């Protein structure tokens, strides 16, 4: 079974980590069998599964239900579950109560969004036995504060993002996840922090990559984000597409230049 220690060893060895979102047992089992090391039960289910316009309405009850489903299908992969909006920002104690429910539902790690100001919560949780994935850069739960889905780290804000990563690393975060971050900045963060980094739209130099399952399978028609690749193209089954994703992450051929944000 994949553990925090496994991820640390992979970072040290330079072996890339493959992560995908999963929301139910059958896809979790398929991804697990295909060699995906980490399954993210993301609040992205609000849009991908529930048909909502953002992640904000997703409840802790929703997250626990889908975590239970994924846990029934996964045998080897590490399950990371999102703390949903409103379930952890009020206090460290509120965060622990919500995280404990997710862990009881089958999660092995919880993910929270936020920079330096959330590092205290990261420390509070990890000291009480709950591994934390700290999500920095573009944080979808704060999309209205950002004014939309924008690339992070431009306009003199690189140091602030680096400070966010350092704060969570110092607080004991098991993983730092960066979303929509300039590739060179993400590389610097990866070289600076001791914990593994996972990128989504954060270049090829992170310790691992993650995509939303529906995006990498080309389920949603129309325009997709720059960092998305449809792995169903050229493959005749979902399992073949997932295996291709894992292989490209491991070979460092995904993300390619066309998927990367640069100045």
Curated annotation (Swiss-Prot):
Gene Ontology terms: cellular component: cytoplasm
Residues annotated as binding Mg(2+): 43, 82, 113
Enzyme Commission (EC) number: 2.1.2.11
Positions annotated as active site in the UniProt record: 179
Main enzyme class: transferase
Cofactor detail note: Binds 1 Mg(2+) ion per subunit.
Described purpose of this protein according to its UniProt entry: Catalyzes the reversible reaction in which hydroxymethyl group from 5,10-methylenetetrahydrofolate is transferred onto alpha-ketoisovalerate to form ketopantoate.
Protein name: 3-methyl-2-oxobutanoate hydroxymethyltransferase
Organism this protein belongs to: Neisseria meningitidis serogroup B (strain ATCC BAA-335 / MC58)
């Amino acid at each position: 079974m994949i553990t925090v220690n496994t991820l640390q060893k992979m970072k040290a060895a330079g072996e890339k980590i493959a992560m995908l979102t999963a929301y139910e047992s059958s896809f979790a089992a398929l991804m697990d069998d295909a060699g995906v090391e980490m399954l993210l039960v993301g609040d992205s289910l609000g849009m991908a599964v529930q048909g909502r316009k953002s992640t904000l309405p997703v409840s802790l009850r929703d997250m626990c239900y889908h975590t239970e489903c994924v846990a029934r299908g996964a045998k080897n992969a590490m399950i990371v579950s999102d703390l949903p909006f409103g379930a952890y920002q009020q206090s460290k104690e509120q965060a622990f109560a919500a995280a404990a429910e997710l862990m009881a539902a089958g999660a092995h790690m919880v993910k929270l969004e936020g920079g330096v100001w959330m590092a205290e919560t990261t420390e509070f949780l990890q000291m009480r036995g709950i591994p934390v994935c700290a999500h920095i850069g573009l944080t979808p739960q704060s999309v209205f504060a950002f004014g939309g889905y924008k690339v992070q780290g431009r306009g003199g804000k690189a140091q602030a993002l680096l400070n966010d990563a350092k704060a969570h690393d110092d607080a004991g975060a098991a993983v730092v996840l960066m979303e929509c971050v300039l590739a060179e900045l993400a590389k610097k963060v990866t070289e600076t922090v001791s914990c593994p980094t996972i990128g989504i739209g954060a270049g090829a130099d992170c310790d691992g990559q993650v995509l939303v399952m529906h995006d990498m399978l080309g389920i949603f028609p129309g325009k997709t984000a720059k960092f998305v690749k449809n792995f169903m193209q050229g493959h005749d089954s979902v399992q073949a597409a997932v295996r291709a994703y894992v292989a490209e992450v491991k070979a460092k051929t995904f993300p390619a230049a066309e998927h990367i944000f640069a100045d």
